[in-house]
UniProtKB/Swiss-Prot annotation:
Biased composition (Basic and acidic residues): 161-175
Subunit structure as annotated in this protein's UniProt entry: Part of the 50S ribosomal subunit. Contacts protein L32.
Gene: rplQ
Phylogenetic classification of the source organism: Bacteria, Pseudomonadati, Thermodesulfobacteriota, Desulfuromonadia, Geobacterales
GO (cellular component) term, any one: cytosolic large ribosomal subunit
Pfam family, one: Ribosomal_L17
GO molecular-function term, one example from the UniProt record: structural constituent of ribosome
Family: Belongs to the bacterial ribosomal protein bL17 family.
Name this protein carries in UniProt: Large ribosomal subunit protein bL17
Domain of life: Bacteria
Keywords attached to this entry: Ribonucleoprotein, Ribosomal protein
Keyword Ribosomal protein: yes
Amino acid sequence: MRHNKAGRRLGRTTSHRIAMFRNMVTSLFAHERITTTDAKAKELRSIAEKMITLGKRGDLHAVRQAASYIRDKKVVTKLFSTIAPRYKERDGGYTRIIKLGIRPGDCAPLSVIELVEEQFEKKVKKSKPTAPAQAVATKPAVEETREAAAAQPQEPEVEISEVKDPAEECEAKAD
């Protein structure tokens, strides 16, 4: 039974899987967006968010922990200097996964995992207009419609008489 065994194995050995995710996290922070399969993106999200949380802490121990996982020292510097301050006010949810479809060769579902960049601003409620300006604006349109209706010639009313079948008319003419 597979109880209490979290995470995906992805068909790799433990050392291969750890090395792959270290490379992917380094690439994600270097480029801020990478394309991969859905399963890898979902696993990578948790690792990347833990690294950003370390970056938000910002102390020496956090720097050393991140440096032990991320392969490039320039990327560690970027994480602590530019990426982590971007999310100071945000509690989690630093990454976004966008599904792309399937890969043509092996039909693997592909996704883009990227760092969320937008800044959330408080929305200002729009107040309803209280001035009767809308009613004044519609009056000329109503008057134009009335004038146009008065200018059109009225069709005379025609009485509809009994409709005769064309076949009967032909027979009547033939007699």
